Amino acid sequence: MIQTESMLDVADNSGAKRVQCIKVLGGSHRRYAAIGDIIKVTVKEAIPRGRVKKGQVLNAVVVRTRKGVRRSDGSVIRFDVNSAVLLNASGQPIGTRIFGPVTRELRTEQFMKIVSLAPEVL
């Protein structure tokens, strides 16, 4: 459950380390984002000479949450951290590598690039 002001780790090599959610996209009064949802973020920590700079506002897709995701068989997949992958204006990932596992819930036409770059799909 990601909401406004939530801090997330970045799971790609775009140059950002930590981002803060400033808006949950997809509805005028939408409060929470789960795995696979797109959020608007601002970069809070970035490495030098990265693709993104501190203070930049971007879209991101949530790939891991501490809340987890419930599957139809009743199992729940949870993670230790909240993480996101940064997206450009056309919805493609900015980074060329994804760090850590992602869930099968991202396996839609929109995020197949992220699933194919991830080292493990749970």
From Swiss-Prot:
Gene Ontology CC annotation, any one: cytosolic large ribosomal subunit
Covalent S-S links between cysteines: none
Classification via InterPro entries: Ribosomal_uL14, Ribosomal_uL14_bac-type, Ribosomal_uL14_CS, Ribosomal_uL14_sf
Protein keywords: Ribonucleoprotein, Ribosomal protein, RNA-binding, rRNA-binding
A single BP term in Gene Ontology: translation
GO molecular function terms noted in the UniProt entry: large ribosomal subunit rRNA binding; structural constituent of ribosome
Entry superkingdom: Bacteria
A Pfam family of this chain: Ribosomal_L14
UniProt cross-references to CDD domains, sorted A to Z: Ribosomal_uL14 (cd00337)
NCBIfam families: rplN_bact
Functional summary from the UniProt entry: Binds to 23S rRNA. Forms part of two intersubunit bridges in the 70S ribosome.
Family, per entry: Belongs to the universal ribosomal protein uL14 family.
Quaternary structure and partners: Part of the 50S ribosomal subunit. Forms a cluster with proteins L3 and L19. In the 70S ribosome, L14 and L19 interact and together make contacts with the 16S rRNA in bridges B5 and B8.
UniProt protein name: Large ribosomal subunit protein uL14
Gene giving rise to this polypeptide: rplN
